[in-house]
Curated annotation (Swiss-Prot):
Intrachain S-S bonds: 49-530, 66-486, 140-204, 298-346, 553-590
Chain intervals for the UniProt region annotation (Hydrophobic membrane proximal region): 676-729, 683-729
Protein name (database record): Envelope glycoprotein B
Location (main, coarse): virion
Similarity comment: Belongs to the herpesviridae glycoprotein B family.
Native source organism of the sequence: Gallid herpesvirus 2 (strain RB-1b) (GaHV-2)
Amino acid sequence: MHYFRRNCIFFLIVILYGTNSSPSTQNVTSREVVSSVQLSEEESTFYLCPPPVGSTVIRLEPPRKCPEPRKATEWGEGIAILFKENISPYKFKVTLYYKNIIQTTTWTGTTYRQITNRYTDRTPVSIEEITDLIDGKGRCSSKARYLRNNVYVEAFDRDAGEKQVLLKPSKFNTPESRAWHTTNETYTVWGSPWIYRTGTSVNCIVEEMDARSVFPYSYFAMANGDIANISPFYGLSPPEAAAEPMGYPQDNFKQLDSYFSMDLDKRRKASLPVKRNFLITSHFTVGWDWAPKTTRVCSMTKWKEVTEMLRATVNGRYRFMARELSATFISNTTEFDPNRIILGQCIKREAEAAIEQIFRTKYNDSHVKVGHVQYFLALGGFIVAYQPVLSKSLAHMYLRELMRDNRTDEMLDLVNNKHAIYKKNATSLSRLRRDIRNAPNRKITLDDTTAIKSTSSVQFAMLQFLYDHIQTHINDMFSRIATAWCELQNRELVLWHEGIKINPSATASATLGRRVAAKMLGDVAAVSSCTAIDAESVTLQNSMRVITSTNTCYSRPLVLFSYGENQGNIQGQLGENNELLPTLEAVEPCSANHRRYFLFGSGYALFENYNFVKMVDAADIQIASTFVELNLTLLEDREILPLSVYTKEELRDVGVLDYAEVARRNQLHELKFYDINKVIEVDTNYAFMNGLAELFNGMGQVGQAIGKVVVGAAGAIVSTISGVSAFMSNPFGALAIGLIIIAGLVAAFLAYRYVNKLKSNPMKALYPMTTEVLKAQATRELHGEESDDLERTSIDERKLEEAREMIKYMALVSAEERHEKKLRRKRRGTTAVLSDHLAKMRIKNSNPKYDKLPTTYSDSEDDAV
């Protein structure tokens, strides 16, 4: 009864929860509520496993034979010299001869000077002048003769005659670059005003500088930027020198044997003769000492000296590993002949000398050389000169074995180093003999016109070294792991035999890699494949109790699932790992305080007292791991060092022109050969007076006398004009002149206004105060106002009338004068003048004479005032 009440309460709680949670879930059963916790089809898959009947049986594999661990690669030791392509240019000294011609056209004004044109050109110096004057006397001619526009033209320094000028050092000489020249001034002629003049300057310049040429040495460039299209090794003899390229007519080239050049600083001839080349171009002549090509240049150059080089054979190719460089170089096993490289004559000489030096300082007491120096062409265009070495203790062991076997010839070969013994396996001497006998005699040959090109970076070699290091470590590690794994599997096979007896289905599923059901049939197991069931067709039931019994319960939860299409629901039990059991055989006696977790999909279904409680997330359950960690040995630390094939200096020096040096020389050219800080003051007035004096001096004594007068007057005029010009050029003088002009304009404007005022109203202009008083009095009288007694008594009527008469006569006199002036201008003869005079007399007699006013006033007048 207690069990029944508890189930009823559980069902009521589930139904009430479903009713309150959603109004649309009314009238649902408890089975449907439990079904709502089922999985979607994406979350998990269930399997239906039929019972095995023995149609398919399996057995466990017997133990395997485990492989042996991998043997490490054996390396031989030796000394190696690495060669790379020589990209540096061939440098040599040249002497440049040329004459710098500057023609300057000037224009002289009255107060200024201008350079209207400046023409500059370089002309070559003849070979005869070089041999006779420059290297013979340390001098150079002031005359320049050159070809322009198919015509020979001549130029003379300072427009004077030809002369031999001493060569003097320039102001900026260095041990690498020296120069000499004949003058440091640019000749400039300033003529008289309004005249063009032209002056010519010829500066003979000798420059000693560096020149460069790169492979294939068909031309060379000089430090100043000039380029000569001729090989520096060209010559008339020997025949190989005459075969060098030359891009000029043969007449422009000359080679002199036993030539003694002069040191222009010490003024002494050289003590040793040389074979001297001279080349004439359109703008310069260049000379240099000839030398054989094979003794001066080499297409390869020494890059690195490796004191400890390891060599091994991997996949039919040599691996040269240099730990100190962190690089590995790969080559064929056939030797390479460096004599076949064009201009590669230096490889053997430098390699043998460097190897001998390293062996003498480091290996002489502990090792012996084995065979001769071997040469190999490595990937990337590098030559590896390799000298195998062998420790003395190991060599003594070989000698004792040879002496014991009475093999005298081989012993002598080893002692005399006639064979290159390479120790691939040091376990037996027969292997060494076989290596010597089977060593290939073929050598790689190149065409005579072939040159080796080296890469500019050895990152590939460093990566190869890193790869070989990692490959060796990983391969050894995997070899040991494979052996240990095989042995572990053989030992665990016993556990598998025992496990399949305890749980055949789980063991068979683990070994076959798929879900199967199994049972033991003696020494073999019968299996049957499981079928996947969709998660949507699987429903978990809420009770694990057997309905027909009160004390029997199911040990696994009950489920309903459907299998296939148009199939009804099948009731079964939930097995392990989402396995569906189509039977109800898993039962147990009911126990108190029952609590179980069963895997259902990706989560766990919790049952308490054989009733479903809730779904528990798998993440909420702690994991007990059975995985055994594999602790492997880590790689040892290996630093990748930066390694450059070519340095910055080599890359910067790869071209024939150093543009920084060319730009620097061009900027210093004027400073080296011309004094640009010297200032020459030119007086154009003196030139003008000197020209006039020379003109009159050519006319004899009379001309000289006239010239003195004219030159004196002209000098005064020029001095006056120069003074005025100097005053005007002064800013204060110009300001004063401007102020004076402005003041004059203002004064002229005021005078013009006064004259116009005098013409229009003379009395107002002459007597402004009197006219103002009279105007005011007339205004008051016009308006009927009476003046004060003072004003009325201050004016004498008689005097006023006399003043009026005086003004009238003054006007008549002025009119008469104007009339006379007009008559004289018209020049009409004496009749007009006489008639005018008679008119004056009539006017004069008709009017009373003007009486002068008394100077004193009478008493009556004073009383009136």
